[in-house]
């Protein structure tokens, strides 16, 4: 029995019995109180029902208490504050949870959540102009782990990468590759400022020279541009795919911006919005701080973005008459919705924080308020090595790429460390710290806890084979896990599903990293206490019954840590 799930179901049943309203009760929360004197679990159901029924919350809470106190796993119920219902759970119910984790793991960790949501999550979407730098890693890991979490709680999820292959930076890429091609043919070249001087484009020039000789130089501009662009973009995408794969990240779809232009999808989207009365010709006010004479006050086609909460309407055409990047965004959102997505999630870098309102406006308009949209911003990573910041710029030709850092510390460290702060807070990534074997290094601390649980089970198998066989057969008395420390860690184990659910609900993967660090800390404390007090050790040869119970506890800890690490795409270590 998962106590969180069971209590939620019993509250819903009680709500139907008392107020014939189980739908509202389903929105109630069940949380772990910050202060232990408020019980083990707390619910706000009384206040939700009271608001609907126009009754005093404490009166509602008292009625719930009368019904719920009869449940076999409830020790006591107290009403607190404006109407919170605080529950104390019987110790044997907590203890029994260990057996459920070990014998019914899949069912125990099952989360009953709305499965009608079809989520499209777009993340990374780095310009295909070179190797991915470490600044992209945070959004890549955040988006990938969030997608894994959403899939874990049974949502349908499409992981998408938007390939920006129609902008000015692609033109710069083509110009640079053309120069590298000429260089491969023996010409002396200079890479002008604004292009890409990195050596990673030299092989592309060599490949083109080998395949075409000097034929590209005899072609007209458009023909040559098309060949080099197609070749260079695909090679850079291959590079990005490999960088992502080495981080354990695989997208379902790589969607080309250029395809929106080629298939006329932008024109279709504009016509649709015109039919909805959302496109008009007008002028925009000058940006703050601009001298009026410097502002191009031309009449242009605008999307009524302000109707949906944006700060200003958005132009869909550039001064030369070509479609704006915003027009591509409109068509891209329409394409996602037409493919069946009813919830769009965009993961953007800190430099795109100004895009939040305009993206929300796009989806609200095209989704006709029926499609959900969330835009999540990942703040900067302060990447340092021995306290010295690493410069990150493709244009400078020397930067810390994802591959550089992956080669240095490995994907698991990168993935875990990118989750050690909330996504909208800056993150310090220190290469020295992440390789330390100390409690100050969170990934080591969590992995070491997993290794120690494996060690406990191995030691018991070696020293007490008969007892270990009994443990594997489920012959253990969990009532022996009665110390305050043991009950507290059992409560934490049971709350794993709650953490996973909250991570999915609030789009906060860092909650899982925080949970694992907390669980590892409590486990290490128990381990260290046993080193000083032999009666608290996990394996006690003179006390087989207690050893069996603690083997069950150690095994449950191992399973939960492994489950948490697997959700965030980190491989649990069995030895160090």
Swiss-Prot record:
In chain numbering, where does the motif 'HIGH' region fall? 126-136
InterPro entries (alphabetical):
aa-tRNA-synth_I_CS, Arg-tRNA-ligase, Arg-tRNA-synth_N, Arg-tRNA-synth_N_sf, ArgRS_core, DALR_anticod-bd, Rossmann-like_a/b/a_fold, tRNAsynth_Ia_anticodon-bd
GO cellular component terms, alphabetically, are:
cytoplasm
EC number(s) of the enzyme?
Answer: 6.1.1.19
Q: What is its main location?
A: cytoplasm
The family database entries (Gene3D superfamilies) matched by this protein are listed as: Arginyl tRNA synthetase N-terminal domain, HUPs, Isoleucyl-tRNA Synthetase, Domain 1
State any single GO MF term. ATP binding
The record lists the catalysed reaction(s) as: tRNA(Arg) + L-arginine + ATP = L-arginyl-tRNA(Arg) + AMP + diphosphate
Q: What processes does the entry annotate via GO biological process terms?
A: arginyl-tRNA aminoacylation
Q: Which CDD domains match?
A: ArgRS_core
Q: What class of enzyme is it?
A: ligase
Quaternary structure and interacting proteins, as annotated: Monomer.
Which PANTHER family would you find in this protein's record?
ARGININE--TRNA LIGASE, CYTOPLASMIC, ARGINYL-TRNA SYNTHETASE
Q: Which family does it belong to?
A: Belongs to the class-I aminoacyl-tRNA synthetase family.
Q: What is this protein called?
A: Arginine--tRNA ligase
Q: Which organism is it from?
A: Rickettsia rickettsii (strain Sheila Smith)
């Amino acid at each position: 029995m998962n106590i969180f799930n069971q209590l939620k179901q019993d509250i819903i049943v009680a709500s139907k019995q008392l107020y014939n309203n189980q739908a509202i009760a389903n929105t109630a929360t069940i949380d772990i109180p910050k202060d232990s004197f408020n019980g083990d679990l707390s619910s706000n159901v009384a206040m939700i029902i009271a608001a609907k029924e126009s009754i005093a919350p404490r009166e509602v809470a008292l009625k719930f208490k009368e019904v719920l106190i009869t449940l076999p796993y409830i020790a006591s119920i107290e009403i607190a504050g404006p109407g919170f219902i605080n529950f104390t759970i019987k110790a044997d119910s907590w203890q029994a949870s260990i057996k459920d984790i070990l014998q019914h793991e899949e069912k125990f960790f099952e989360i009953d959540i709305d499965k009608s949501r079809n989520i499209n999550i777009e993340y990374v979407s780095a310009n295909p102009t070179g190797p991915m730098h470490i600044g992209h890693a945070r959004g890549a890991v955040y988006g990938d782990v969030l997608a894994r979490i959403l899939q874990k709680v049974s949502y349908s999820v499409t992981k998408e990468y938007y390939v920006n292959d129609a902008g000015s930076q692609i033109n710069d890429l083509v110009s640079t590759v053309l120069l590298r091609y000429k260089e491969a043919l023996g010409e002396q070249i200079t890479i002008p400022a604004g292009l890409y001087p990195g050596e990673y484009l030299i092989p592309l020039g060599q490949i083109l020279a080998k395949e075409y000789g000097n034929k590209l130089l005899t072609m007209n501009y458009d023909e040559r541009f098309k060949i080099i662009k197609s070749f260079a973009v695909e090679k850079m995408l291959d590079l990005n795919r490999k960088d992502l794969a080495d981080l354990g990240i695989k997208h379902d779809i790589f969607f080309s911006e250029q395809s929106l232009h080629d298939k006329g999808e932008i024109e279709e989207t504009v016509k649709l919005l015109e039919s909805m009365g959302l496109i008009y010709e007008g002028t925009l006010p000058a940006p703050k701080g601009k001298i009026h004479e410097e502002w191009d006050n031309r009449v242009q086609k605008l999307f009524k973005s302000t109707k949906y909460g944006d700060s200003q309407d958005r132009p869909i055409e550039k001064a030369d008459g070509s479609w704006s990047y915003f027009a591509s965004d409109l068509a891209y959102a329409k394409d996602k919705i037409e493919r069946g997505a009813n919830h769009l999630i965009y993961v953007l870098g800190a430099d795109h924080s100004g895009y939040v309102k305009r993206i929300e406006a796009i989806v609200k308009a095209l989704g006709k308020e029926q499609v959900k949209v969330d835009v999540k911003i990942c703040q900067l990573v302060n990447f340092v090595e021995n306290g010295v910041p690493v410069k990150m710029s493709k244009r400078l030709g020397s930067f810390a790429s994802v591959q550089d850092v992956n080669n240095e510390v490995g994907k698991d460290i990168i993935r875990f460390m990118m989750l050690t702060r909330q996504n909208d807070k800056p993150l310090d990534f220190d290469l020295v710290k992440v390789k330390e074997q100390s409690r100050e290094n969170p990934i080591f601390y969590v992995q070491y806890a997993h290794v120690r649980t494996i060690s406990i089970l191995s030691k018991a198998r070696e020293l007490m084979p008969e007892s270990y066989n009994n443990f594997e057969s489920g012959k253990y008395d969990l009532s022996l896990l009665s110390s305050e420390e043991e009950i507290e860690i059992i409560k934490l184990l049971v709350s794993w599903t709650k953490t996973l659910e909250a991570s999915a609900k609030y789009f906060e993967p860092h909650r899982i990293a925080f949970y694992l660090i907390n669980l590892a800390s409590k486990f290490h404390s128990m381990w260290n206490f046993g080193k000083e007090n032999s009666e608290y050790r996990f394996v006690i040869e003179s006390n087989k019954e207690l050893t069996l119970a603690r083997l069950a506890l150690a095994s449950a800890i191992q399973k939960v840590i492994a489950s948490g690490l697997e959700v965030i795409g980190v491989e649990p270590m069995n030895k160090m």
